[in-house]
Swiss-Prot record:
Purpose of the protein: Involved in ribosome biogenesis, probably through modulation of rDNA transcription.
Sorted UniProt keywords: Nucleus, Phosphoprotein, Transcription, Transcription regulation
GO CC terms of this entry: nucleolus
Disordered: region residues: 178-206
Organism of provenance: Saccharomyces cerevisiae (strain AWRI1631) (Baker's yeast)
Keyword Nucleus: yes
Start-end of Acidic residues biased regions: 197-206
Similarity-based family: Belongs to the RRT14 family.
Modified residues (Phosphoserine): 197, 202-203
Gene behind this protein: RRT14
Keyword Transit peptide: no
Primary localisation category: nucleus
Superkingdom of origin organism: Eukaryota
Stated name of the protein: Regulator of rDNA transcription 14
Compartment(s) of residence: Nucleus, Nucleolus
Amino acid sequence: MSSSLSQTSKYQATSVVNGLLSNLLPGVPKIRANNGKTSVNNGSKAQLIDRNLKKRVQLQNRDVHKIKKKCKLVKKKKVKKHKLDKEQLEQLAKHQVLKKHQQEGTLTDHERKYLNKLIKRNSQNLRSWDLEEEVRDELEDIQQSILKDTVSTANTDRSKRRRFKRKQFKEDIKGSDFVKDHRYPGLTPGLAPVGLSDEEDSSEED
C-alpha cells in the first residue's frame, strides 16, 4: 500500500515538474518516473534543471535591466526635446509680442530692458562670429605670405647661383690660355710682334 502511494506521489511530482519545464523551458525533455535504481540519475537531472532555471532567471533579469535602461534614456531624450521645443516656442512668441509693441510704440520699461539686453547679446554674438572670420582670413593671409616668401626665396637662391656660375665662368675664361695668341705666346691678341710691320703681315696674307 505504501509502495503504491509512493509511486503515485512520484508520478504526481514528475507531472508537476514536466508542466513547469514545458512552460519555462520549452523543448527540454520530460522526466520519466522510474524505480529507485534511477534515483541518482533523477537527482542529476534535477540539479541540471535547477541550474538551467537559475540561468534563465539571470538572463531575464539582465534583459529587463537593459530594457529599463533603454526606456529611461528614450524618456529622458523626449523630455529634453519637449523642454527645448517649449522654450523655443515661448521665446518666439515673446519676440513676436516685443516686435509688435515696438512697431506700435507701446513697449513697457521691462520689455524695453529685455529688448536692449537681447540686442546687446546678439551684437556680441555677431562680433564674435566676425572676429572668428577675421581670424580665419588673417591666418589664410599669413599662410599665403609664408608660401609666397618661400617661393621667392627659392627663386632668389636659384638666381644667385646662376649669377655666380656666370661670373665664375667668365673669370675662368679670362685666366685661360685660349684667349692668348697661340702663334706668339705672351703677346696681347691683335698686336704684331717686334720687328714685324703691318706691311709684312699683309704680304704674308697675299
